[in-house]
Amino acid sequence: MERNQRKTLYGRVVSDKMDKTITVVVETKRNHPVYGKRINYSKKYKAHDENNVAKEGDIVRIMETRPLSATKRFRLVEVVEKAVII
C-alpha cells in the first residue's frame, strides 16, 4: 500500500510515558443511527514516536503503518501544535 493511501488521523497526545510510544486520542462526531443526534466518539491509538518529540497535550498527525508491536499500528508524522504549559 502506498504511503498516500494510508489512514491519516489527527489527535491529542494523552500519554508519553512509554519510550518511543505515545497514546493519541482521536475525537470524531457521528449521527446516531436511529435518533439522528450528533454524538462525540473518541478512540485511543498507540503510535510510534522514534525521537520522543511529542509531549502530553500536543496535537499530532499519525499515519497507519505495518504492525510495530502487539498494539502499535500507527506512527507519528508531525506535531501540528505544541501544548501550552501554564
UniProtKB/Swiss-Prot annotation:
InterPro entries: NA-bd_OB-fold, Ribosomal_uS17, Ribosomal_uS17_bact/chlr, Ribosomal_uS17_CS. One of its GO terms (molecular function) is rRNA binding. Keywords: Ribonucleoprotein, Ribosomal protein, RNA-binding, rRNA-binding. Transmembrane segments: none annotated. GO terms for biological process: translation. One of its GO terms (cellular component) is cytosolic small ribosomal subunit. It comes from the Bacteria. PROSITE patterns: RIBOSOMAL_S17 (PS00056). Belongs to the universal ribosomal protein uS17 family. Part of the 30S ribosomal subunit. One of the primary rRNA binding proteins, it binds specifically to the 5'-end of 16S ribosomal RNA. This is Small ribosomal subunit protein uS17. It comes from Streptococcus agalactiae serotype V (strain ATCC BAA-611 / 2603 V/R). The lineage of its organism: Bacteria, Bacillati, Bacillota, Bacilli, Lactobacillales.
